[in-house]
Swiss-Prot record:
The lineage of its organism: Eukaryota, Viridiplantae, Streptophyta, Embryophyta, Tracheophyta. It is found in: Plastid, Chloroplast. This is Large ribosomal subunit protein uL23cz. Belongs to the universal ribosomal protein uL23 family. It comes from the Eukaryota. Part of the 50S ribosomal subunit. It comes from Sorghum bicolor (Sorghum). One of its GO terms (biological process) is translation. GO terms for cellular component: chloroplast; cytosolic large ribosomal subunit. Pfam families: Ribosomal_L23. SUPFAM superfamilies: Ribosomal proteins S24e, L23 and L15e.
Amino acid sequence: MDNGIKYAVFTEKSLRLLGKNQYTFNVESGFTKTEIKHWVELFFGVKVVAVNSHRLPGKGRRMGPILGHTMHYRRMIITLQLGILFHFYPLNSRVF
């Protein structure tokens, strides 16, 4: 399984959810909740209690006379067990 998580999201809502031990990520749109749950548990070594997701729409873009749009993407809110500390880097890698 490839890395499904694109990046962590830091909005007002996601920062408020950090107090509830919930973390927000944008993920590849083809991944399911169970795949992301298993990937987070394996890669970060934490216990995931729940995974909520929603699909965000693409936005219209214009370059001169050409109309286009950006791709849609999926956002997942991952709830961890209470008392678990979460680091945004994997436990088995070196961070410099």
